[in-house]
Each structure stands twice: as C-alpha cells, then as structure tokens.
Amino acid sequence: MLTVRFAPSPTGYMHIGNLRTALLNRLYADHAHFLTGEEVSFVLRMDDTDRERSKPEYEQSVYEDLEWMGISWDRLEHQSERLDRYRQVVDELKARGRIYACYETAEELEYKRRRQRSRGLPPVYDREGMTLTDARKREYEAEGRRPHYRFVLEHRETSWDDLVRGACAYNGAHLSDPVVVREDGTFPYMLPSVIDDMDFGITHIIRGEDHVTNTAVQIQMFEVLGGKVPVFGHPPLLTGREGKLSKRLGSLSSRELRGEGIEAMTIACLLARLGTPDPIVVCRSLKELAETFELSHFGRAQPHFDPAELFKLNPRVLHALRMEEVNARLEKRGEPPVDAAFWA
C-alpha cells in the first residue's frame, strides 16, 4: 500500500513551509488513489524527542492546523514513545561495527572544519574516532568526556530516481559519517527517521530539497538495516521576492492566515501549483484538487511565495462555496443568511 508520512516537530507553530510539505504528501497519496482506486495511507509522526522544546500546545496546534486544512491522517505515532526501539537498533549496529564512538568536543570539531576549509578541502569528518585505542578512550572518559556515536558510511556512490529532481547520486566519501547518538544519549533526526519509516511501511517520502544529502545518507541506513528503500521526492523550497524566504514569511503560521480570513482551500490551491507550469485552479476540496495534482510537474527552480497572492485568490475560493455552506457559517456567527439572488 502506498504510504506517505508527515513528521513535524512540535517545537513551535506550523508555518507555511510545514503546511506545504503536509499538503503535498496528502495530495500525492490521494492522487494515487484517484488513479488506481487502491488504498493509501498517511502517517502523522510527531518528532518530539526534543524534550526541552517540544510542548503539548504546539502538538495540539499541529492537529488543529491539519484538520483546518482538511488533511487527514490514518496513523499517529510519537518518536518519544519509541526510544527503546532506537536503542535496540543502535546496539545491533554497534555489534556489527557500523557505529563507532567519538570523543571530540564541539569546539574541536569546528577547529577541524576550519582547517579543512582553509586548505580548500570539504569539511568532512576525518574518522579519528575509528583509530582510538581502548586506552585512549578510557583516558578521554577519565577526563569527563562522554562519547557520541557515528554511523559508518560506505565510500561509494548512492543513487536514486527522485520524483522531482530525476536522477540523483552522491558519493559517501564526500559526506561526513552522521552522528546517530549524542553525548547525552539522545538521538538526532537521521537514524530514528529511517527506523520509523521501515517499521511503519513508508513507501514514499516527500520533503524539501534541503534534505537531499540526508537522503543519500539514509538510503545507506535502509540498506544496512535490510529495509526497502522508499521512493523519494524533493520539491524545491519556497523563496520570497528577494530570494531566500524571509524569516517573517517563512514563519507565517496557518493561525495567522486564518486570522486574516484566508480560506484553507486558498492556501491549498496556491501551494499545489506554486512551482509548476500548471495554472492555479479553484477547487472546493482536497479530493478534487488531488485529481489533477502532479508532483512531477514541480521544477527545480525555487518558487516565489507572496502572501499577496493568497489575498487575490481568496475571493475566488469564497465565491466557489455553495450557498448552504456560506449560510452555515453565517449562522455560527449569528448573522442573517444570504439568498440565491445575492450569492449568484
């Protein structure tokens, strides 16, 4: 069964980039269902392992925002409830020699990177941890240092056929072995995400192009763990008029847009086409929008997001509402209904 996932971190309110990722996953799955009639699944996974920054109110806001957008999910998971599973896999990888201990401090690692850059070399980790003797490790630990652990990348080409970017390939020799366990025993994003994708049967991963190098790393993790590698798609990131999406636009939350009177379908209709050559069409539901959605139509160029476009499109979306829907809203607000002549 085609299965996608959306994995927000409940460390703040959902912004326009988060909404776009969730929307593209929902539309991709629903388009596949429209074409084949086969069942699809959408997994909502809370990446809530950041114990200090993850808040219940932010998690609740994710549910509210997705429901407002009409984005439903079939399964809900929390990474904070799966820590034992991650530890189990880490222990297995240690036993197989695919994870090794390192003792550098953050300052020492930054010094290494600066030296490499000054010599015109890429800032790739030098695998010093692999060469440490047991005696040297004991010395470090006697100093009060605690190890972090890295996954051993194979120095070979990793390739995949991307749903948006086409053929992609990265050589593991040009990438640093990723940290998979921090000094305090917590887990960065990379390995738990792969474990979850395997355990939950994720078949397609659609996320921003800033994850492309992560994909090269994670494909090797899938292969080492014996999992089936999902299909990947990396749409380009949104930009503002001056290029990079400003902090103000990038952090624009759905609740702010809602407060401005923007319809959920206005956001959906714009984001589903922004970055494609397809014209923006007004649809009354995500199901209708999904019928003509094509992820492969997204280009490599980063699309420009301008909130003003939402305000231009919003009246068209409102006018597409049925009179019964409008009157139901007016009734909730204690306002008189409109008649057919007014709404025509």
Describe each model-derived feature in a short phrase.
Residues S54, H78-R82, A101, V152-L153, ...:
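Catalytic cores of large soluble enzymes that bind and process phosphate-bearing ligands
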